[in-house]
Regions:
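Phosphate-binding P-loop
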Residues: 17-23
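Short beta-strand-centered segment that lines the nucleotide-binding/catalytic pocket of NTP-utilizing
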Residues: 49-64
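The conserved Walker
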Residues: 32
Length: 145
């Protein structure tokens, strides 16, 4: 699916949020600046979260509790080894289970082999401008492209 601008990215994220349930896991992949956090802002909008959504690159995770379903936003970009990434992921996953939250993970490459039953979103730069989104459901079926 082609997305031309920030507004369309927010709208796509908001629509996508309606597919999610408590304890859904979403893996977000894409290069730096592709719009991963903007897409998460759209998901938060779709969940009626009123807090400002910012990138958790330096803090590793942000927790949002004001919406219909709580949201945990994890960013593993700064982590360099699998054991650290796994430790943080499993801790945040436990929190998501306890709070019935959705867990969204940016830069999930180190932990993807250890996770089952997740949504996978690949964001890429389109040829001249905009972004291309490929969204796969937990059964690995293409839902948007």
């Amino acid at each position: 699916m082609f997305v031309e601008n920030l507004k369309e990215t927010i709208n796509l994220g908001s629509k996508f949020a309606k597919q999610l349930n408590p304890q859904s896991i979403v893996l977000l992949k894409g290069p730096i600046g592709a719009g991963k956090t903007t897409f998460v802002q759209g998901i938060a909008k779709g969940l009626s979260i009123t807090e400002d959504i910012t990138s958790p690159t330096f803090s590793l995770s942000h927790h949002y509790r004001s919406g219909e379903i709580p949201l945990i936003h994890l960013d593993l970009y700064r982590l360099e080894n699998v054991s650290s990434a796994r430790e943080i992921f499993f801790s945040e996953e436990e929190e998501a289970i306890q709070r019935q939250a959705i867990l969204i993970i940016e830069w999930p490459e180190l932990i993807e082999p250890f996770i089952q039953n997740f949504w996978k979103i690949n964001i890429g730069y389109a040829k001249n401008y905009g972004r291309h989104y490929e969204i796969r459901d937990p059964k690995n079926l293409l839902t948007f492209s």
